[in-house]
A protein has these predicted regions:
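Membrane-embedded alpha-helical signal segments
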Residues: 1-276
C-alpha cells in the first residue's frame, strides 16, 4: 500500500515499522507519525468485519462498531457468517485489511507530515538531472528550500499530489518573485491537475460559491486579522460552515463531486474553517 500511495502522491512514503506495545489492550492497535497518535481502534483477528457500504437485505448478528477508516456502520462477525453477510449486501474484509486500509487512509490524509526538507531536496536533485536550469533558477535563487518544502506540504495537506514535480516547480518559479504567499498562487498553474483530483476529464464539476456581499464581509475579516490563523468571528464562521454543509448535503447524497470556489485571499482561511 505505501508503494502505491507513493506513486499517487509523488514522493516515497517511509517504511512502516510495526512493534508490540504492551500498554495497549490485546486487540488494540495505534497508528503514529513522529510519535503522535493519529489513529487507534480494535480488530479481532479471528473474525471478519462486515461493512454496510450499501443497502442491506438481512442484518447479520455481530459486534457492532464503526469502520475505522470512513466511519461506516459495521460489525465483527464469525468467519462462517461471511457468505451470508456478503449475500445480504455487506462488504466483508479480514482484520489485516481493516488495519491496512486504516493505515493507507491516514497516510493519504497526513502525507504532508512525512515530507521534510531532506525529502524535498532528494526530489529536486532527481528533477535537476533532467531539468537543471529549472531547479537552479528556483532554489535558492528565488526561494529557499524551506519555502519550497512548505509549498509542497501545503499542496499535499489539501489533497493535491506533487507527482508532476516539473509542472509544480515551473508554476512555483513563475509566481515566486511576485508574491509573499507562493503556496497560494502556485495553484493557478496547477488548476487543471487540481480539478482532475475531483473529477474525470469529461465529468462536470459542480461548484458552491458565495454571495458577493458575504464574500466582501469575509474578505474584510481576513484583511483585518492580518496573518491571523482564525480570521473569522466564531458566530460568522459557524453560520458559513452550516450554510456550506447545507449546500453540499444534496451533492454528497447524490455522490456528485463538487468544489467550493472563492477568491485567492479567502480560499485558504475558508479551507481551514471548513476542515476544522
Amino acid at each position: 500500500m505505501p508503494l502505491k500511495l507513493s506513486k499517487e502522491l509523488g514522493f516515497v512514503i517511509p517504511l512502516v515499522r510495526v512493534r508490540d506495545e504492551i500498554a495497549l489492550g490485546p486487540f488494540t492497535y495505534r497508528i503514529l507519525i513522529d510519535g503522535v497518535v493519529l489513529g487507534e481502534d480494535e480488530v479481532f483477528p479471528d473474525d471478519c468485519l462486515a461493512l454496510e457500504a450499501g443497502p442491506i437485505d438481512t442484518p447479520v448478528p455481530g459486534r457492532v462498531v464503526k469502520d475505522p477508516s470512513f466511519g461506516l456502520p459495521a460489525c465483527w462477525i464469525a468467519p462462517e457468517e461471511r457468505d451470508l453477510a456478503t449475500a445480504s449486501g455487506y462488504t466483508v474484509v479480514d482484520a489485516a485489511t481493516v488495519i491496512g486500509t486504516h493505515l493507507n487512509h491516514i497516510l493519504g490524509q497526513q502525507s504532508h507530515l512525512l515530507l521534510g526538507q531532506d525529502e524535498v531536496q532528494a526530489l529536486l536533485d532527481t528533477l535537476a538531472a533532467a531539468h537543471p536550469q529549472l531547479v537552479a533558477g528556483l532554489v535558492p535563487k528565488l526561494l529557499p528550500l524551506a519555502t519550497v518544502t512548505t509549498v509542497l506540504q501545503r499542496l499535499l495537506e489539501e489533497g493535491v499530489p506533487i507527482r508532476d514535480l516539473r509542472r509544480t516547480i515551473s508554476s512555483l518559479a513563475a509566481v515566486a518573485a511576485r508574491t509573499q504567499d507562493p503556496a497560494e498562487l502556485v495553484r493557478i498553474g496547477l488548476g487543471g491537475a487540481i480539478v482532475q483530483t475531483r473529477c474525470s476529464l469529461r465529468e462536470p464539476l459542480m461548484a458552491i460559491s458565495f454571495a458577493s456581499d458575504l464574500e466582501d464581509l469575509l474578505t474584510q475579516a481576513v484583511r483585518a486579522s492580518g496573518s491571523g490563523a482564525y480570521p473569522f468571528d466564531p458566530a460568522l464562521g459557524g453560520r458559513v460552515g452550516e450554510a456550506v454543509r447545507a449546500a453540499a448535503a444534496p451533492l454528497i447524497a447524490a455522490g456528485t463531486r463538487f468544489a467550493v470556489v472563492t477568491t485567492p485571499l479567502l480560499r485558504r482561511p475558508l479551507w481551514g474553517l471548513l476542515n476544522a
